[in-house]
């Protein structure tokens, strides 16, 4: 593989490299074999693989040969054998072939993504999730509309093969991919006759297909949007007198609409920003309502022709940030006006100016979070704490750790919101539910539990000092954090409650 990477650096015709011989390299399947044995949680499968015949690379090569011959007796995604041990053994070999197929196809994809994406109109598709919230905080105040879209999961298998064929000219390496995709498409369980790629299914093969497909879509869509809505214009940036600048522009347009409409339109400087997490993408636009209507019209057409699917179930929702809120990433996203008092001293005179700026203000969805806590049997639908009977068989430390972990995850994820009064209501619900669970376990009352365990025990687990696990945080830093927005570095592990609430919002929309 290092040889292929070297080849990709030196020669621009790396598309002509032959990947098919890599399928017969035993190292690929040995890596998956060791990974399967190390990560398997089933002792029965471990005993079966160790007691049965040893892992045979010859069997893997024969399976690859049968794929090339289009042998219909091989069904990758169906369990046809009544013997569970034989069926598990077959499934293991088929998964190893898929793993090898994925590893081989990742070689040119990694080369292409590393050396080609840098030149696409200064757009880079690989960004860490750590930068999503700071990106929204930086770009949303300078936008007035957002478009919220969802990328479809259902994809025709031939579309996937064609996207690979654009940059892989080795036809034999595409035959195994086409065979696997079409066998799954024609299976009796698949009624839609298309590939359902769910990135939440943690398989290397599906994740690779999803990432590659979304990468191909974004590599066309985002540069197209950049070129369409970024004209050469006089950009006034985000100066304090931007409001007065816009008033002057409106005055000029009103007086000279007939003569210089095109030149004045270039001064308006429409801007567009794109961000995506999982299957949801957000397009922030600074422009007129007509521009937003054009985007809403062209985006479904682009998706319909590129995805070859009817895009009505994945409609584009537009929101005006100054009036409406958009639900995304577990927040209600909005932009609010923030007054600023500026004092300017010139010689002996002091001038005071009131300015109004836009500020990104994410809102914590307290009511939906309480509803999700009610589904987890931590409170009722009105927010009244109840005991978690399922946890009464655990030790006291385990119960306290679980409640504390829930509170810590919620607070860390929603620490980007400045309005935290609702968060402390969630803290009260969790702490009282924890006390009721301990009281139910010991068959006593909450007062007795607090008296026996002591109030310091609850302060230890639900204290504000534990909200910051960094020794560099002092008391002054903790006090300052109440007035400042903090995006913690562990937010890539998105809270399950936020994900569940987002699914409910998607079903409603």
Swiss-Prot record:
It is found in: Plastid, Chloroplast. One of its GO terms (cellular component) is chloroplast. Its main location: plastid. Keywords: Chloroplast, mRNA processing, Plastid, RNA-binding, tRNA processing. GO terms for biological process: mRNA processing; RNA splicing; tRNA processing. GO terms for molecular function: RNA binding. Disulfide bonds: none annotated. InterPro entries: Domain_X, Maturase_MatK, Maturase_MatK_N. Usually encoded in the trnK tRNA gene intron. Probably assists in splicing its own and other chloroplast group II introns. Belongs to the intron maturase 2 family. MatK subfamily. This is Maturase K.
């Amino acid at each position: 593989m290092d040889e292929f990477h070297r080849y990709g650096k030196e020669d621009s015709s790396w598309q002509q490299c032959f990947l098919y011989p890599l399928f017969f390299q035993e190292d690929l399947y040995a890596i998956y074999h060791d990974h399967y044995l190390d990560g398997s949680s089933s002792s029965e499968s471990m005993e079966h693989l160790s007691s049965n015949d040893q892992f045979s690379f010859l069997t893997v090569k024969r399976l690859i040969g049968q794929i090339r011959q289009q042998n219909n007796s091989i069904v990758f995604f169906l369990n046809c054998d009544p013997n569970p041990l034989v069926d598990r053994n077959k499934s293991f070999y088929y998964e190893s072939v898929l793993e090898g197929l994925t590893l081989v196809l990742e070689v040119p994809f990694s080369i292409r993504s590393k050396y080609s994406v840098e030149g696409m109109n200064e757009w880079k598709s690989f960004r860490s999730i750590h930068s999503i919230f700071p990106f929204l905080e930086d770009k949303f105040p300078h936008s007035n509309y957002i478009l919220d879209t969802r990328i479809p999961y259902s994809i025709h298998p031939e579309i996937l093969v064609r996207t690979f064929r654009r940059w892989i000219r080795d036809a034999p390496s595409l035959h195994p991919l086409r065979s696997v995709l079409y066998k799954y498409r024609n299976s009796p369980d698949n009624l839609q006759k298309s590939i359902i790629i769910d990135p939440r299914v943690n398989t290397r093969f599906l994740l690779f297909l999803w990432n590659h497909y979304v990468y191909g879509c974004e590599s066309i869509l985002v540069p197209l949007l950049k070129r369409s809505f970024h004209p050469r214009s006089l950009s006034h940036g985000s100066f304090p007198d931007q409001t007065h600048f816009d008033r002057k522009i409106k005055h000029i347009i009103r007086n000279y609409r007939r003569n210089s409409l095109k030149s004045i339109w270039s001064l308006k400087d429409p801007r567009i920003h794109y961000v995506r997490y999982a299957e949801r993408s957000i397009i922030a636009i600074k422009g007129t309502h007509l521009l937003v209507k054009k985007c809403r019209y062209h985006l479904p057409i682009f998706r319909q022709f590129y995805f070859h699917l009817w895009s009505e179930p994945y409609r584009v929702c537009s929101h005006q940030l100054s009036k409406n809120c958009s639900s995304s990433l577990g927040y209600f996203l909005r932009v609010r006006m923030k007054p600023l008092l500026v004092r300017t001293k010139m010689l002996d005179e002091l001038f005071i100016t009131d300015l109004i700026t836009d500020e990104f203000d994410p809102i914590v969805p307290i009511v939906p979070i309480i509803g999700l806590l009610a589904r987890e049997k931590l409170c009722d639908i009105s927010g009244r704490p109840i005991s978690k009977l399922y946890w009464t068989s655990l030790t006291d430390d385990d119960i306290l750790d679980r409640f504390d972990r829930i509170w810590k995850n919620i607070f860390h994820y929603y620490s980007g919101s400045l309005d935290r009064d609702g968060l402390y209501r969630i803290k009260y619900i969790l702490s009282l539910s924890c006390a009721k669970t301990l009281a139910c376990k010991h068959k006593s009352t909450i007062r007795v539990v607090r008296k026996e365990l002591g109030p310091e025990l609850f302060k230890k687990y639900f204290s504000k000092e534990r909200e910051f696990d960094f020794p560099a945080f002092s008391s002054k830093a903790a006090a300052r954090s109440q007035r400042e927005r903090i995006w913690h570095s562990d937010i890539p592990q998105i809270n399950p409650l936020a994900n569940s609430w987002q699914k409910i919002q998607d079903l409603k929309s």
